[in-house]
């Protein structure tokens, strides 16, 4: 090398602050750094597909403390409750809070006691507009193909999808 050049090296002490985003594949997907396969249906909005084992789930017999810990660990507000490969309910922060408030021992109760079993299920071929009434009811959309659970779509998933499509 014949000419002098300056080199700037950024050496963080850890990756747990701003660089932590680079370690999070879901953040990278949402922000367009990874390409995702497009299907032309509601699968394009599912951030954590169940078929790829990306969906964080609970079983009906799991304890509410387990649900709370998973919500905290993965920074999510709701979890599908699966009996094998069949979705039987959904549990969100409000369900847990309302169940345990006033009696913290209830964290040891089973998920099946506190979960919601009235589900807003949409077929994968439903139009994106079909999500709006689900969200208007304060629910999360459960996407299926026939009887097969594909994943969840939340309000933020729809917003991220719309942002990615913006010019």
Residue map of PLM features:
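The conserved cystathionine-beta-synthase
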Residues: 56-75, 81-83, 100, 120-139, ...
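Surface-exposed, flexible loop/turn segments at secondary-structure boundaries
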Residues: 15-16, 149, 158
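Bateman (tandem CBS) regulatory domains
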Residues: 40-56, 107-119
